[in-house]
A protein has these predicted regions:
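Acidic, glycine/proline-rich low-complexity segments that act as flexible tails and inter-domain linkers
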Residues: 1-41, 45-120, 149-152, 168, ...
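Preference for long, well-ordered alpha-helical segments
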Residues: 128-178
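Acidic/histidine-rich alpha-helical segments that form the ligand environment
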Residues: 107-141
């Protein structure tokens, strides 16, 4: 059963008529059957923070607190961590991948990212959030690695697809908000 999102619904209603498709997508994208409500909300919140859209992030955080009760703290913490880590990782790994030089490939990144191995929710949930952010950044290497990790953890391709759909719609909604 999808989570109620009254704060997001109120914000969604402020999108202009020119973005009716985005308004409708924002109303439906969190209701898929391939992700649990906590996963869908976590991906959406991570995406909102990743694209630095404070109104969306605030609405999603409010709805996450209301919908998940005790589980909200972990989901919110992981969404914040995933957005922050992916903001760093997508720049670094996209740089290495785009250059394609062995001299860079062999170097240690020397960037801390231990939270990825010790999420507050689950490895699978954190990877879903990370995949959404990787797609937003267009980091091919990151997308491939997070999708492979998710499949290894037992997630379906449909779940991966839904996570990226959520991130895409959040990104589009951010464009229409002041």
């Amino acid at each position: 059963m999808p989570a109620a999102t009254p704060a997001l619904d109120a914000l969604r209603d402020t999108l202009p008529d020119d973005l009716k498709d985005i308004r409708l997508n924002l109303g439906s994208v969190l209701t898929g059957e391939n992700l649990q409500p906590a996963q869908a909300l976590g991906v959406a919140l991570a995406a909102a923070r990743f694209v630095r859209c404070r109104p969306l992030a605030d609405a999603l955080e409010s709805d996450t607190r209301a919908a998940l009760a005790d589980g909200a703290v972990a989901t919110i913490a992981d969404a914040v961590a995933a957005a922050g880590l992916m903001a760093m990782n997508t720049v670094y790994y996209r740089f290495r991948h785009m250059l394609g030089k062995e001299s860079y490939e062999g170097r240690s990144p020397r960037l801390r990212m231990s939270r990825m191995a010790q999420p507050a929710t689950s490895k699978l949930d954190f990877e879903l959030m990370s995949l959404g952010c990787a797609a937003l950044a267009g980091c091919e290497l990151c997308i491939r690695n997070h999708e492979a990790s998710l499949l290894h953890l037992g997630a379906s391709e449909d779940a991966c697809h839904d996570a990226v759909r959520i991130a895409a719609v959040v990104n589009a909604a951010a464009c229409g908000l002041p």
